Amino acid sequence: MKFQKIRQWCKKRKWWLAAAGVLLIAYYFCLPRQLFPTPTSFVLEDANGDLLNASIAPDGQWRFPFNAHVPEKFEKCIVAYEDKRFYYHWGIDPVAITRAIKQNMSGKKVISGGSTLTMQVVRLSRNQPRNIWQKMIEAVLATRLEFAASKKKIIALYASNAPFGGNVVGLEAASWRYYGRKADQLSWGEMAALAVLPNSPALVHPGRNRKTLLNKRNQLLDKLYRRKT
């Protein structure tokens, strides 16, 4: 009797169920197998991992190959600066989105986007215009990425593909470009300076905006100190 009721319920809603099935299949396959098919630099290192030589990538960017290892300092800095609820959401942060909507409406212009780190990874991989429609697509893809990858992997994808000013892409390339050392060897101050760059990569420019960069870095360091990081 119970089975017959379920069968009747499904029969009455067969088109809705079919549509839901199609949407689920589309959702499952919506994420590309390779998020970043972009070319990378040829990198030559010694036995200790120190850089001996590197060539620019075919697209003119200093983009080192993907590195699954992300220094703890950078992870703490970027989460504190970009997405403090990163470890607790599934790709989208309703609190951040609500705050962004209020700020934008109050200021009558785009002040905040409310994007999570996961959404930023998706945006970096797609390179599409920044508008509301694309933001909605990024949100859907971000939830799918959260099912497909660990939080550590998402941080690593961000660190390897975020822009760090000029034609420098990725944390490791930025570390060598600006400090001449591996990312693992950077101080908290140096790492904090790099962590604020992807949000405004134009901050790094010879003789321009250095004060703004230092202010953002110091604000991040103060936030980390107050959180006893």
Provide a role label for each language-model segment.
Residues 2-229:
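Juxtamembrane regions of bacterial inner-membrane/periplasmic proteins
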